[in-house]
Amino acid sequence: MNRFGTRLVGATATTPPAPKARSNENLDKIDMSLDEIIKLNRKEGKKQSFPRLNRRLQQSGARQLRMRVRWGVQQSSGFGKTSVSRRGRVLPGKRRPYGVITGLAARKATGIRKGISPMNRPPLSDKNIERYFPALKRKTSLLRQNEVQRKPVAVLKRPNQLNRKNNIPANFTRSGNKLSHQKDTRQATFLFRRGLKVQTQLNTEQLIDDVVAKRTRQWRTSTTNGGILTVSIDNPGAVQCPVTQKPRLTRTAVPSFLTKREQSDVKKIPKGVPLQFDINSVGKQTGMTLNERFGILKEQRAALPFSKGGSRFVTVG
């Protein structure tokens, strides 16, 4: 044992000072038991793993504050509080606080940060926009302010338009009393196809009151019609007043010297008597009387031989 020790000492005499300390440690380990050597190795391993952490903890307070402000990490002072690194990870060797979010709650929290999936997305209301998308809310508010600034000042209406009590809307014929109008048109077409002239007169005052008063839907309106339907039937016996209308001149008037002068101003009366019968029946007439005609027919019937079943004609004697 002494020889081996003297050899090691002689060998380490020529080596630099750093390995000398290691050789002394090795000599101590030889004298130690196995359990002591394992404990010593564990201590040395821990010392080698923590120098980097100790260096970080020895940084100046100003530099730590600058880094925290830069990466958006809140300053936490006091013993036992967790410190967060640049990438958001908890540094080793620090005690975690109570009430750590784990499981489904942690997934929800990360989902809020990263973005919500379309399956679990909440309805897009003002509260949810403020909660999940604050930046978007700020942008929309700024856009609204710009729109309000750009919007021109509304021009005031004329006083006579404002003071009117019964302002008829522009789409009055479309919206108001649409069903009654359709009913009138159907009735008019039905009568017109049977040769009857139809004229509809709508009571405009009643229609205006209906539009102002009634705010109900179209299918709830009453079936009573405010219009008056008048039917005029052609009566040839009635005296019709002649309507004097000036003829339109499609071309320039012909000069007086070119027009033919009429020989007499008196109208020519046509000769003859007006016919009271069909003119086509004149050619069918003959000089034979009715008695002669019926006598010929009787003779023809008598000449025909009687059939077995008897005669179909009956002779009146």
Swiss-Prot record:
GO terms for biological process: mRNA export from nucleus. The modification N-acetylmethionine is found at M1. Belongs to the UIF family. Interacts with DDX39B/UAP56 and NXF1; interaction with DDX39B/UAP56 and NXF1 are mutually exclusive. Interacts with SSRP1; required for its recruitment to mRNAs. Interacts with CHTOP. The modification Phosphoserine is found at S23, S60, S117. There is a cross-link at K139 (Glycyl lysine isopeptide (Lys-Gly) (interchain with G-Cter in SUMO1)). The modification Phosphothreonine is found at T14. One of its GO terms (molecular function) is mRNA binding. Keywords: Acetylation, Isopeptide bond, mRNA transport, Nucleus, Phosphoprotein, RNA-binding, Transport, Ubl conjugation. A motif (UAP56-binding motif) lies at residues 26-44. It comes from Rattus norvegicus (Rat). It is found in: Nucleus, Nucleoplasm; Nucleus speckle. There is a cross-link at K260 (Glycyl lysine isopeptide (Lys-Gly) (interchain with G-Cter in SUMO2)). It comes from the Eukaryota. GO terms for cellular component: nuclear speck; nucleoplasm. Residues 1-23 are annotated as: Disordered. Required for mRNA export from the nucleus to the cytoplasm. Acts as an adapter that uses the DDX39B/UAP56-NFX1 pathway to ensure efficient mRNA export and delivering to the nuclear pore. Associates with spliced and unspliced mRNAs simultaneously with ALYREF/THOC4. This is UAP56-interacting factor.
